[in-house]
Amino acid sequence: MDCRPMNEEGRKILDRLRRLCSRREYCRKDVMKKALDALDGDAAAAQEVVDVLVDEKYVDDLRYASAYARDKAGLSGWGEVKIRHMLAAKGVAREIISEALGQIDSSKAQLRLEKLIENKYRSLKDDPQCRLKLLRFALGRGYGYDEVARVVDFLMKYD
């Protein structure tokens, strides 16, 4: 499958990275870092290894971003803002991030936010800065200010 000239060390590293990428998703930037580390900083050889992995579909930023967004939203309870920021830090393109975030069920995310704030509210009920602390907590989880403020205000008004 690989018709490019590559030395023995490059082929070994390529095989190792194929095994890694077949076990879980990696973004292009993470694979490039692993290749650079293994090749002692040889950027040209590392780029060649990454290009082969992308051509062979071992590395796909959209697939990585979709899995990352799904896991962080579903398992970690992160909001769209935090997921977007973390994927951008991984070097994933904006269009790919938007497409991956579009796959998240917004109604489930809203329910998760409500439950998250409701649970935190129970521990802060008597605190004079309850609203501020709830806002800060939910914003830190990566939810947008408007949706957080709406849920917090509703909860405090009807409690």
Describe every region a protein language model picked out.
Residues 1-159:
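An alpha-helical, amphipathic repeat domain used for nucleic-acid recognition
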